[in-house]
């Protein structure tokens, strides 16, 4: 493929935009460098870049484009909203309708508040949990990404009995000292940390199904034990369902897994592609939020008509019968094909899949936590990524990210992708 225009555009972008990208995850730094491909148009399961190259898209904007690009029902809703004015700064009927839809989908949401991003949703659930409990410390699992607010950009300390350290310049050590990080899927270290710090902990942040060091499911009984131990300590359980809500099941991971949190943070998928976030939970906890309670949160763009209309339309599409079964069927087909190609070409991989999302790790180890995900071959993934790009298959430029299927992918797309994987694996095998 020819990437001349993408390369020229990136060179120009470097003159005007920090690093040439508006989110570091779009950079090709983690896959060997080079100019990231600039896309010009998306439709269904496909992208076309500025050079005219066509791709089957498995990035799906890091998950939220579950209905495919430019879905006609969602596009029509956005267009209608735009014609009526995109921002009022007042209550609307749309926000009430959308809140009711979210509550019907996720029974753990007694009350809901809309915001503008997943980062904002998580940030506010932390504030609400602190207000409700009167405590300050937060727990999280290593490797799980909860946005870019200071409190969640914290890496693990040297063990479960030590506090965190800043994971970004500009995050004060004093903030990191309010965060305890423990490994995912490990009850013993969670218990040890709660034994030491539990009386100071306001809440634990949980990705019920991990999506930020690949797709990693909780071990059987793990989430139930998290609820039990955290509640025994008098703290709250916050589910970050920014990736998982409406991705694996209409009612989110909490419905799929049958475990109920106290608070839930939402984003991405629920907006149908427009900027959005939301948080909600038990009535007595949510009533800590202004104007009813002392926990302040506000936003001019929150609940704007365009995002509300897009979100309503997205959920209407996702209510279609058989939609999630189709995603699971295509995911299983893709998984089987990739594993067969890996065996054929003697390429060592571990593949984690849940329904319509999967991650290919270049390792033979089982991936159940962040340490295992880190100990995979990033250089091999970078080569694989570039080979797949040449084949017209668009993936996320990171070994930690997932492949996301949409409702618009077809069996023919999957068949082509498997063939492309085979050619990429053959090239990798030839250069071992």
From Swiss-Prot:
Record-listed N6-(pyridoxal phosphate)lysine modification sites: 268
Reaction(s) the record says it catalyses: (S)-4-amino-5-oxopentanoate = 5-aminolevulinate
Xref: InterPro entries: 4pyrrol_synth_GluAld_NH2Trfase, Aminotrans_3, Aminotrans_3_PPA_site, PyrdxlP-dep_Trfase, PyrdxlP-dep_Trfase_major, PyrdxlP-dep_Trfase_small
A GO term for molecular function: transaminase activity
Keyword Isomerase: yes
Subunit comment: Homodimer.
Family stated for the protein in its record: Belongs to the class-III pyridoxal-phosphate-dependent aminotransferase family. HemL subfamily.
NCBIfam families to which the protein is assigned, alphabetical: hemL, PRK00062.1, PRK12389.1
Protein name per UniProt: Glutamate-1-semialdehyde 2,1-aminomutase 1
Organism: Bacillus cereus (strain ATCC 14579 / DSM 31 / CCUG 7414 / JCM 2152 / NBRC 15305 / NCIMB 9373 / NCTC 2599 / NRRL B-3711)
Gene encoding the protein: hemL1
